[in-house]
């Protein structure tokens, strides 16, 4: 049972029976929680339009099992203004949280990282930097500790002009080979600072987070990624045509 109203976001919702909803929510104080909202789909329900992803909510629930019962819900504000590729990117963020985080593990600091990511997506045209910062915050919240600033082999500071190869659970070692697991030193420094100045640094961050998140996602593809691939292709086609 929650102690009072809790700040939450709906990650995913699905219909249940004729008039109810099952909600997967991410809360500030309780982490990821599954809720049953009885009667939320009925015509008389005042919650019908409120229990949506990307709308800041105050929720209260009861119950001790894996599925709680929603008792009270209040929208804090209107939903975040997300559209196009940024909407699909926010759906990707929600799917990652739902897939990777364990249920009912409090992560108040990461909740703020999540909120910051959605806010960035709502107010910036290019979603890529926000997505990379969010993925890195997620890895950090799960205890995925990687030192981007020191060579794992020697302990020396990363040289921006050198090439380093990533070794899972160990870090980065100097390398003369170039493949999917190697990164330039300046790219590693940019990832550590979560500040991406060049396209190459942003691409390197994406490549690293894909490698690091793969064990947590298993072989099951992300649905949100499949949804926004046609949108990305269309956007690229329009850019070429200009």
Curated annotation (Swiss-Prot):
Any Gene Ontology biological process: DNA recombination
SUPFAM superfamilies: ArfGap/RecO-like zinc finger, Nucleic acid-binding proteins
Keyword DNA damage tagged: yes
Statement: the UniProt record of this protein carries the keyword Metal-binding: no
Keyword terms of this UniProt record: DNA damage, DNA recombination, DNA repair
Highest taxon of the lineage: Bacteria
GO cellular component: bacterial nucleoid
Cysteines paired by S-S bonds: none
InterPro entries: ARFGAP/RecO (IPR037278), DNA_rep/recomb_RecO_N (IPR022572), NA-bd_OB-fold (IPR012340), RecO (IPR003717), RecO_C (IPR042242)
Pfam families membership: RecO_C, RecO_N
Similarity comment: family membership: Belongs to the RecO family.
Matches recorded under NCBIfam families: reco
Function: Involved in DNA repair and RecF pathway recombination.
Name the record gives this protein: DNA repair protein RecO
Organism of origin: Vibrio atlanticus (strain LGP32)
């Amino acid at each position: 049972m929650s102690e009072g109203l809790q700040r939450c976001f709906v990650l995913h919702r699905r219909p249940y029976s004729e008039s109810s909803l099952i909600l997967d929510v991410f809360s500030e104080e309780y982490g990821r929680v599954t809720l049953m909202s009885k009667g939320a789909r009925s015509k008389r329900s005042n919650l019908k339009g409120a229990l949506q992803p990307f709308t800041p909510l105050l929720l209260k629930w009861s119950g001790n099992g894996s599925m709680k019962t929603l008792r009270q819900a209040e929208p804090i504000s209107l939903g975040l203004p997300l559209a196009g590729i940024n909407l699909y990117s926010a759906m990707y963020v929600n799917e990652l949280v739902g897939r990777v985080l364990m249920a009912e593990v409090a992560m108040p600091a990461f909740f703020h990282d999540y909120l910051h990511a959605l806010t960035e997506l709502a107010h910036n045209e290019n979603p890529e930097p926000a997505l990379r910062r969010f993925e890195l915050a997620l890895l950090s919240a799960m205890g995925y500790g990687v030192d981007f600033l020191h060579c794992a082999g020697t302990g020396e500071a990363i040289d921006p002009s050198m090439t380093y190869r990533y070794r899972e659970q160990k870090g980065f070692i100097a390398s003369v080979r170039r493949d999917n697991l190697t990164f330039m030193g300046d790219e590693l420094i940019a990832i550590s600072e979560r500040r991406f100045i060049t396209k190459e640094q942003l691409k390197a961050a994406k490549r690293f987070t894909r490698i690091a998140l793969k064990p947590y996602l298993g072989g099951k593809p992300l649905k949100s990624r499949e949804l926004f691939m046609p949108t990305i292709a269309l956007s690229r086609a329009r850019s070429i045509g200009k």
